[in-house]
A protein has these predicted regions:
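His/Asp/Glu-rich mid-to-C-terminal helical/loop segments that flank catalytic regions of hydrolases
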Residues: 17-20, 24-32, 68-81, 188-242
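Short, highly charged C-terminal tails/helix-capping segments
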Residues: 40-44, 97-107, 233-253
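Short, intrinsically disordered/low-complexity patches at protein termini
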Residues: 85, 96-97, 207, 219, ...
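Hydrophobic alpha-helix feature that most strongly marks membrane-spanning transmembrane helices
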Residues: 88, 120-124, 176-179, 186, ...
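Hydrophobic, well-ordered secondary-structure elements that form the walls
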Residues: 115, 174, 219
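Zn-dependent metallopeptidase/amidohydrolase metal-coordination segment
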Residues: 132-216, 234-265
């Protein structure tokens, strides 16, 4: 409810206060979830730019991550309770709008090992002096960079790990249904952070294209192996079934939620 913040603040009900209290609640929740849980948020609407007005509307966008779908669902329930509590404390109304969701990625060591073997069969890309100089300049702008050796030029041995890279992708949903493997290549200078301007600056560079083509060849090699070696495919399927332990894929997106641009409100 909008009102004049100086003359009649008692008549207003601040949605911005509710969002602020909600965000504070998120901070306290961090102490009581698993260390692998990630809770991100961005205030996308503060209700306006006039401080002398009780803000009648406000909006916050929340992104939750965890190692598995069940944990995300549990944290989501608690986050929604915090939102309801914030609305109750401020006398405001609440609307929860579900935007998107993806599933956790199920690792597959059978395919991972085969993918690395295919990488090792390939010749490493040859980078020109200009390529190295460009990557070195970009790397020098990053405190974690290595301007003297900006391009990774080795292929490490396969190392089975259970921790999946904590970025969100709908590849995770695919991995619940069929054995799945992903490969990464040095398309960024050593030490580059994702979503940084340095990552954007090299996205269309020659070294990035060369590394991408190499990974494409390795992935094609995995596909050929699966066609020519039925036993490899069966081993990958067996591993997937073992990891799922009888669990069936359930889409984490509720029924009725349709794709849309984030800028479009429900």
């Amino acid at each position: 409810i909008s009102s004049h913040a100086g003359i009649s603040p008692h008549l207003g009900r601040s949605a911005l206060d509710a969002v602020t209290l909600f965000n504070v609640g998120i901070q306290f929740l961090r102490e009581h979830v698993l260390p692998s849980v990630r809770m991100h948020y961005a205030v996308t609407d503060t209700g306006g730019f006039s401080p002398n007005v009780v803000q009648p509307t406000a909006e916050v966008l929340v992104l939750l991550r965890a190692e598995d779908n069940a944990t995300v669902a549990d944290v989501r329930s608690r986050v929604e309770d915090i939102a309801r509590g914030a609305a109750l404390m401020t006398g405001t109304e609440l609307e929860i709008d579900f935007v998107k969701a993806t599933s956790n990625t199920v690792p597959n060591h059978v395919l991972g090992r085969d993918a690395v073997e295919n990488l090792k069969l390939l010749k490493l890309p040859e980078f020109s002096k200009e390529d190295v100089e460009f990557y070195s300049k970009i790397s020098a702008t990053n405190k974690n960079g290595n301007p003297g050796h900006p391009i990774a030029d080795t292929i490490p041995d396969f190392k089975p790990v259970e921790i999946v890279f904590p970025a969100s992708s709908d590849v995770g949903d695919v991995s619940w249904i069929v054995p799945t493997v992903s490969l990464s290549a040095p398309t960024w200078p050593v030490g580059t952070a994702a979503h940084s301007w340095q990552a954007v600056a090299v996205g269309k560079s020659t070294p990035a294209h060369k590394a991408t083509l190499m990974v494409g060849e390795a992935m094609a090699g995995v596909a050929v192996d699966l066609i020519e070696k039925p036993e490899l495919l069966e081993q990958a399927k067996e591993e997937l079934n073992r990891r799922l332990k009888g669990s069936k894929y359930e889409c984490p997106i509720p029924k009725g939620v349709v794709p849309r641009a984030l800028s479009m409100k429900k």
